[in-house]
Amino acid sequence: MNDKTENTLSSDVTEVRAQKLKLLREQVGDVYPAHFHRTLTNAELGAKYESLESDVETQDVVTVAGRVYSSRNSGMFMDIHDASGKIQIFSHKDTTPEEARALLPMIDIGDIIGVTGIVRRTKRGELTINAQKIEMLTKSLLPMPEKWHGLSDIELRYRKRHLDIMTNEDSKLRFQQRSKIVSGIRRFMENDGFMEVETPMLQSIYGGATAEPFKTHHNTLKLDMYLRIAPELFLKRTLVSGLTDKVFEINRNFRNEGVSTRHNPEFTMMECYWAYADYEDMMDLVERLFETLALSIHGTTEFDFGDKQLSFKGPFKRVPMPDAVKQVTGIDFLAIKTDEEARTAAKAAGFAVEKDWTWGECLAFIFEEKVESTLIQPSHVTHFPKDISPFAKEVPGEPRLVERFETYCNAWELGNAFSELNDPEEQRRRMVEQLEQAHARGEKEKQLDEEFLDAIDQGMPPAGGLGIGVDRLIMLLTNAPSIRDVILFPARRNKAD
């Protein structure tokens, strides 16, 4: 069947449905009522009558509602689904009034109906409602995709997510699990004594990460503003305030950068700060959180992702970045003393590095190129270069490294954490240096956040900070190959493109 034929058939079906809608308006009146009272969801009905034996009819009258997914024998048998599950509807001249049966020819797959009737279980063991009353609640003007095949076009699944979920039980389950995971993160953090706050999504100065922001303009304030790339600086100001010693936020960040199977310009992060803790405390927190989430979704800490079996049972492997690079490439960065020596060693090993790269930039680049892909089971990579970590405390005895770790699994970065820098003079020095580097890269709009520095001058307690990429974590826990599979309505090109 070609596209032209398919579009013609779809148009014909739509016209037939429109004619039925016209007749229904004339015969019934309002076929899109504002309210309908059901006594049970389909799942509640199934649970209540779980022990009902086959070929038994009760005297119980119930009212249910849902979308029609299948119709057999001219509507004698229909399956209707609500969000909780399905129930079979039976309409017959011996049990169903003529007024209710008269509606059957007007009902199409995809319509939403309400049904009142007697509960029974068929000889084949199917829980069924013998319809006594049927009401049209929503007339669907478009045909549903074929239930058993769903939407085969992946892009169409993202563009028309409502149809994807309507016809794909895996997609429906995945988004139910997403809700459970996000709620689980929030519950875990609150039970651990963290207070949830909300910080600005619109910011006049963007910071807390190195990324390209989305820019907008506030007409009343006559002020250019940015969608936040991270909540870090505001959360630290909250810590300074003394409102709480343990603060967190679950919300979206926005970065005007590439789209891939692991990147979406709008994504969900959980970021938290814990006064009087350090990065090792944050490692423990990550392990406890991940284990809790795995148990809530799978009932065990071990689960499959693609052809791999992953384990969220702590403790996770911990390895300093210089050690990890040495193990994989043989390059001993701790024995290298200067930036020039680092570039020379990297080039000798076959890596293309920029002529102005520092020791730390060379180390981080080689780690990303050669080591990340080896980190399949959950691992904390610690001791990052200070060059690329302006907000972390130095490792005692090794001023080129900082108390920072990233958590990896399936070769993906899932989390990033520091022993947070709270020395106001060192913080200013590093932020000024970072600003100069940004301006050198052509990021002329980048500004120094003096309000944040003023708060740090006031005094921030020692603290551990952590950010977790919620979408990637959900990908792992739900066996989703693309980030767009776990974002309800992901970024996509316009249809015309």
UniProtKB/Swiss-Prot annotation:
One GO term (biological process): lysyl-tRNA aminoacylation
Reactions catalysed: tRNA(Lys) + L-lysine + ATP = L-lysyl-tRNA(Lys) + AMP + diphosphate
Cofactor-binding details, from the entry: Binds 3 Mg(2+) ions per subunit.
InterPro entries reported for this sequence: Aa-tRNA-synt_II, aa-tRNA-synth_II, aa-tRNA-synth_II/BPL/LPL, Lys-tRNA-ligase_II, Lys-tRNA-ligase_II_N, Lys-tRNA-synth_II_C, NA-bd_OB-fold, NA-bd_OB_tRNA
Keyword Nucleotide-binding: yes
Amino-acid positions noted as binding Mg(2+) 1 in the UniProt annotation, renumbered to this chain: 406, 413
Keywords: Aminoacyl-tRNA synthetase, ATP-binding, Cytoplasm, Ligase, Magnesium, Metal-binding, Nucleotide-binding, Protein biosynthesis
Pfam families according to UniProt: tRNA-synt_2 (PF00152), tRNA_anti-codon (PF01336)
GO molecular function, one term: ATP binding
Name of the top EC class for this enzyme: ligase
Subunit field text: Homodimer.
Protein family according to the UniProt entry: Belongs to the class-II aminoacyl-tRNA synthetase family.
Protein name, as recorded: Lysine--tRNA ligase
Source species: Rhizobium leguminosarum bv. trifolii (strain WSM2304)
